[in-house]
Every structure is written in C-alpha cells, then in structure tokens.
Amino acid sequence: MAAVVLENGVLSRKLSDFGQETSYIEDNSNQNGAVSLIFSLKEEVGALAKVLRLFEENEINLTHIESRPSRLNKDEYEFFTYLDKRSKPVLGSIIKSLRNDIGATVHELSRDKEKNTVPWFPRTIQELDRFANQILSYGAELDADHPGFKDPVYRARRKQFADIAYNYRHGQPIPRVEYTEEERKTWGTVFRTLKALYKTHACYEHNHIFPLLEKYCGFREDNIPQLEDVSQFLQTCTGFRLRPVAGLLSSRDFLGGLAFRVFHCTQYIRHGSKPMYTPEPDICHELLGHVPLFSDRSFAQFSQEIGLASLGAPDEYIEKLATIYWFTVEFGLCKEGDSIKAYGAGLLSSFGELQYCLSDKPKLLPLELEKTACQEYTVTEFQPLYYVAESFNDAKEKVRTFAATIPRPFSVRYDPYTQRVEVLDNTQQLKILADSINSEVGILCHALQKIKS
C-alpha cells in the first residue's frame, strides 16, 4: 500500500498520469487549499473502509475521490483524493496511522517543497526505459574537439549505434554489431597495450576474471566482444546486466540503474586516429575497465549499494554519491597484501593513467567517504589524488553508513526475484523483510548443522 501527499496544492498530473511524467510532483495552489492524497490498497474486502474509518475518526472531510487499477502492482488499486483544508493540523497523525496501523507506504512529496520533495525514482527494472535515452552529451552528436568530429564516416557510424540504444527496451536481446576492420584494429591496439599491464597493475579480482572473459565472451585482440554475450556472462556471475546507451546519462539516472544491477553501457568505439585517447566512455572503457569487476560478487554488491543509496536522494547527495563513484568505481585503488592495485575502470582502461596512479607522483589517501564525497576532481587530466580502499567489503560497509545519513523518509531494498525496489517505510514491509531474513538464517543454520555432522 502506498500513498503520496500534497498540501496547499494539486498534483502536476492527474491520477491517470501518476508516476509517468515528471521527476518531481509540483506544489501548485488550488482554489480551496485542499490537501491532495494518493494512496494504493491491496484489492481485498474492507481495505478502503479502513482508510475511510480513519478519516472519520479524525473528523476529516473527503471532498473528492478517484480510483483505478495500479500500474505498478496488478493486485492493488490507486485512489486520488481531496481532503478538506481543515485536515492539515492532523495530517501528521493521519500519515503515522496510515503507516503503522494500516501498513501504508506514505511519501510526503511536497508538504514543504524546498525541503521534503522526493525525486521520482524507478521502482521496477522496466522503468529504466523511461530515462535510458535522456543522454546529456555525445550520442550521435559530437563536440568540435572530438577526434571524430570532422570524420563523416565515423559520425554516421555513431548514429547507427545511437539508434540501437534509442530503440532498445528492457528484456530484449542487445542487437549484435558487425564491427569494421578499422574498429577492430583500434580495439586491438587498446587491448594489447592494456593487457600487458594488468598482471602487475590490476587488482586480483580483475586478473582472476579476465581469462574467463577471454574464454567465454570472445575477449581477444582481433575481436570486439558482443554486449549480449557479455551481459549473459555477467548475469550468471553476479546478476548484473548490460544495457546499451547512446551517451552520458545524468548522475541520478546512471546511479539509479546500478540499484537494479543494470550497467548502462556504450557500444561504439573511440576514433581510430587516437586509439589511446577518448573524451567519453566507449566500449573499450566499458568492457576492459568495468565488466571484469562487475563479475565479482563483492564489487557488484558494493556498486549496487551506491545505486540504492541514490534512490530518492536530494540533488546535493546525488552529487556526493557521484563523486564517491568517481573515486571508487572509476578511479579507485585498493590494498592487496603489501601492495596497492588498481580497480577503477578509468584506470584499467587507460594505459597512461594506469602506470601513473601506481607511481610516486599522485597523492594517496585512505578511503573516507565523508571526505571523498566532497573532494574536487579533474576530468581533463590525470588525477592528482586517489583514494585507497582496504577491501571491497570495507568500501561497501562505508557506503551503507554514508547512505544512512541521506535525508529521505524511507529505506529501500532490492528484490532480485521480482526485480523491484521495495520502499521500507511501514511495519508491513518490515515484517516481510524480517520473514525473508528469517528464512535465509534458517538455511544458514541448517547448512552449518550439516557441516558439523
């Protein structure tokens, strides 16, 4: 059961559009100052009567009501209501009763728009379709300083890749691409140069999985792997999957994908005139830098934790999470025995910076997310500063601790069986979670007994 509250205003869309149009619900004034309330109920006898009884007990006058089957859950109905403006003094207690007594999920989206407005976020993996094409730069268009800007053949090729991404929908196989001889040559140069460094510079997890990618996904100097093959491999390892994207997404949208273990991945390759340079993520960066680590369970969980922390977070915290992502998933270093190795994709896909980051030139600091989240960084040259994690598990716990500081009126968890994000803000949801944990603990205890016997 879910509910959305508006005070002194109406929704920016009617019930028929709820959750489908904008990232924020607007706070506009209506004529009588009524409080607008949207809630959803399981389709069962007496469900709505409980809510109406609650209104009656608190002397709340219901002036308007609409209903429709929920688009998010086929077993629920959604109700759009206007409450008389005199209900405002008891609105807080009503919300508390909806949560605790009836089991409602209540989102106070705009009681105070400046402080409490919660950005829209995807609740199902299918909803990633809504923003996957809202790229910020590049795609089929290139900036004037891009190596391929004056190359009409390259620009036409980029449009082909962009069209693939724009037409893709969740659940479809990723279209296969016949890469040109020049594209394979560019890949080969990057692949050969970087592979020579991995043994001495990359972390254990990267080096452990790389031979498996060569064996099962066609990672070779003379072959650019197909995203669909790599995505299938990832799903068998950690549940992560690839999704083609035409260019750079906003930080909020990109991190939101990680919450569902979806990595938005480019399919095009950098311009052949500069095989060791790219101003944007390309397939070399994605497959050589990111994919090996997404195949590791601990790192996959760490990445998903960053994504889950971003859901519904205020804009200033999205910026902090994006900075944490930059200094970990993109440019992170980790301890490995007495040595320090690279695990960030930006390092593992850059021949020059992979050598530089482990030299005596940059400054190395321990990973402390409160400080890391506020650290400025450069996107045009090698980083002057890198953060060193004790381990992926340690980094994961630090992300969880940091997520607890994000001011949002709920917690979230990902259900891998339904591929949905569950909002945990009422006792009913917590009971379901407790039952799930209890079941897992039971399996653990049973397995321990088997081992002891």
Swiss-Prot record:
Report which reactions are catalysed by this protein: (6R)-L-erythro-5,6,7,8-tetrahydrobiopterin + L-phenylalanine + O2 = (4aS,6R)-4a-hydroxy-L-erythro-5,6,7,8-tetrahydrobiopterin + L-tyrosine
Q: Which residues carry this modification: Phosphoserine?
A: 16
The answer to keyword Membrane applying to this record is: no
* Record PTM N-acetylalanine, positions in chain: 2
Q: What class of enzyme is it?
A: oxidoreductase
Q: Cite the entry's keywords alphabetically.
A: Acetylation, Allosteric enzyme, Disease variant, Iron, Metal-binding, Monooxygenase, Oxidoreductase, Phenylalanine catabolism, Phosphoprotein
Show where the ACT domain sits. 36-114
GO molecular-function term, one example from the UniProt record? phenylalanine 4-monooxygenase activity
UniProt EC number:
1.14.16.1
Q: Which InterPro entries does this entry report, sorted A to Z? A: ACT-like_dom_sf, ACT_dom, ArAA_hydroxylase, ArAA_hydroxylase_Fe/CU_BS, ArAA_hydroxylase_sf, Aro-AA_hydroxylase_C_sf, Aromatic-AA_hydroxylase_C, Euk_PheOH_cat
Q: In which pathway does it act?
A: Amino-acid degradation; L-phenylalanine degradation; acetoacetate and fumarate from L-phenylalanine: step 1/6
Any inhibitors or activators noted? N-terminal region of PAH is thought to contain allosteric binding sites for phenylalanine and to constitute an 'inhibitory' domain that regulates the activity of a catalytic domain in the C-terminal portion of the molecule.
Q: Which residues bind Fe cation?
A: 285, 290, 330
Q: How is it modified after translation?
A: Phosphorylation at Ser-16 increases basal activity and facilitates activation by the substrate phenylalanine.
Superkingdom classification of source: Eukaryota
Pfam families registered for this protein in UniProt: ACT (PF01842), Biopterin_H (PF00351)
Q: Which GO biological process entries does UniProt record here?
A: L-phenylalanine catabolic process
User: Can you state the subunit structure given in the record?
Assistant: Homodimer and homotetramer.
Quote the NCBIfam families the UniProt record gives: Phe4hydrox_tetr
Task: Give the similarity note.
Answer: Belongs to the biopterin-dependent aromatic amino acid hydroxylase family.
Instruction: Name the chain's protein.
Output: Phenylalanine-4-hydroxylase
Organism, by scientific name, is Mus musculus
Q: What gene does this protein come from? A: Pah
